[in-house]
């Protein structure tokens, strides 16, 4: 662990392998924290190694795509508002990604295509990325459906579950009437807002990190970012009055 922190010089992500929802993951800033978090993980017998990854500060982005073994269909790119290291299920997600360059979007589309082909995916694939400036890094690749599939399907109008099912039984993306690649962005903003149940769980740690804590989500759609965000907050019952803001 000390060697890892020396190599990376900054924060690292300490995590067990093969977990869902970011269970047991922690961001460590020094050797003492690394040792503490590894001891916590080791309280439960581990069949797989504990991983120590470099922590990058950047913009987190995500795609759900369908691959037929040759071509890939990417309905859109989602951008997370929260800092990197916050679990994707706890992040506010914005479609289309609105603060990254065309180069970053094209790089994400190309990486998605190459990874799906290299993994021989026929069906759904979910990939999470970090953009640090114009550099794009892969966080993780999941050759399966993800919790963002209903969201991206609804806001783009592309039935990716239906398409993936057809692809699995032998159809191609072109045969299903779609052009491969990253699809044209919508002219509206769609924001997915996580919903938490902290008020029902006394003593729960409410700070956000790699381990997922949300229990639901809602959606705000509008022509502008501010209006979509307002609707999403309204759906999550997280609105504040002007009096509360003054306090």
Regions found by a protein language model. Give the residues of each.
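Conserved small/polar residues in nucleotide/adenosyl-binding loops
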Residues: 3-11, 240-247
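ATP-dependent carboxylate activation and anion-phosphoryl transfer catalytic cores
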Residues: 10, 20-23, 27-242
């Amino acid at each position: 662990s000390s060697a890892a922190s020396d190599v990376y010089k900054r924060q690292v992500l300490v995590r067990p392998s093969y977990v869902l929802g970011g269970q047991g993951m922690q961001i460590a800033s020094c050797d003492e924290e690394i040792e503490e978090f590894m001891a916590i993980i080791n309280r439960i017998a581990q069949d797989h190694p504990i991983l120590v990854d470099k922590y990058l500060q950047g913009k987190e982005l995500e795609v759900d795509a369908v691959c037929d073994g040759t071509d890939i269909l990417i309905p859109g790119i989602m951008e997370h508002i929260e800092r990197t290291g916050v679990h994707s299920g706890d992040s506010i997600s914005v479609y289309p990604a609105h603060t990254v360059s065309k180069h970053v979007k094209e790089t994400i589309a190309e990486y998605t295509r190459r990874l799906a082909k290299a993994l021989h995916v026929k069906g759904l694939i979910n990939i999470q990325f970090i953009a640090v400036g114009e550099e794009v890094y892969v966080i993780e690749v999941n050759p399966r459906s993800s919790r963002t599939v209903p969201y991206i399907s609804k806001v783009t109008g592309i039935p990716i579950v239906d398409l993936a099912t057809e692809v699995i039984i032998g159809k191609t993306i072109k045969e299903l009437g779609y052009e491969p690649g990253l699809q044209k962005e919508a002219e509206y903003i769609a924001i997915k807002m996580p919903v938490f149940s902290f008020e029902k769980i006394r003593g729960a740690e409410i700070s956000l990190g790699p381990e997922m804590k949300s229990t639901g989500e809602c959606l705000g759609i509008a022509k502008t970012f501010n209006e979509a965000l307002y609707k999403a907050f309204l759906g999550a019952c997280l609105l504040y009055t002007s009096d509360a803001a003054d306090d």
